């Protein structure tokens, strides 16, 4: 039926040539689904655990003024979104000089955060495109972090 919709009523010869192509498309689709379904977001609890284990580099991509006005997640470093691509391609000496941290390797686990997840997702996509395949983002961002932290402080009181 699909062959007739695509190729008209040309018959079995056309159907024979379409089936291998459809098989190839199905294979590509399965591979893309596996890639796309890889979890790239972290939750508040996962981020807390990762920060406690010191197993990540948390990069806040908000601009410096936002961080000064609102605060930041402890342990994060600030690399504004418009600098992420350039920063991840810097040589290690320049990176250390500018950001006071050792430059991450492509195998290191990076987590990006922002205010509410939009910019951190863009930063993660940039990092992945540069070969940092373990990059993730904290979609809840600073807004969610503050909410959970205040809630935990109240429970401890």
Curated annotation (Swiss-Prot):
Gene3D superfamilies linked: Rhodanese-like domain
Annotated GO MF terms: thiosulfate-cyanide sulfurtransferase activity
Disulfide bonds: none
Active site as annotated: 114 (cysteine persulfide intermediate)
Domain Rhodanese: 52-154
InterPro entries: Rhodanese-like_dom (IPR001763), Rhodanese-like_dom_sf (IPR036873), Thiosulphate_STrfase_CS (IPR001307)
Transmembrane segments: none
Pfam families: Rhodanese
Modification N6-succinyllysine occurs at: 96
PROSITE patterns given in the database record: RHODANESE_2 (PS00683), RHODANESE_3 (PS50206)
Domain of life: Eukaryota
PANTHER family, A to Z: THIOSULFATE SULFURTRANSFERASE RDL2, MITOCHONDRIAL-RELATED, THIOSULFATE SULFURTRANSFERASE_RHODANESE-LIKE DOMAIN-CONTAINING PROTEIN 3
Identification of the protein by name: Thiosulfate sulfurtransferase/rhodanese-like domain-containing protein 3
Originating species: Mus musculus (Mouse)
Classification of source organism: Eukaryota, Metazoa, Chordata, Craniata, Vertebrata
UniProt gene name: Tstd3
């Amino acid at each position: 039926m699909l062959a007739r919709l695509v190729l008209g009523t040309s018959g079995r010869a056309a159907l024979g040539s379409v089936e291998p192509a459809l098989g190839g498309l199905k294979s590509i689709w399965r591979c893309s689904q596996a890639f796309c379904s890889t979890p790239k977001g972290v939750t508040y609890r996962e981020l807390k655990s990762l920060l406690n284990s010191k197993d990540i580099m948390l990069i806040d991509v908000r601009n410096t003024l936002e961080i000064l006005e609102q605060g930041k997640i402890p342990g994060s470093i600030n690399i504004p979104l418009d600098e992420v691509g350039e920063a991840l391609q810097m040589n290690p000496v320049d990176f250390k000089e500018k950001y006071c941290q050792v430059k991450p390797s492509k195998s290191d686990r990076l987590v990006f955060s922002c205010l509410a997840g939009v910019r951190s997702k863009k930063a993660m996509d940039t990092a992945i495109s540069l070969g940092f395949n373990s990059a993730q983002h904290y979609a809840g961002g600073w807004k969610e972090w503050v909410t959970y932290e205040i809630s935990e402080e109240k429970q401890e009181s």
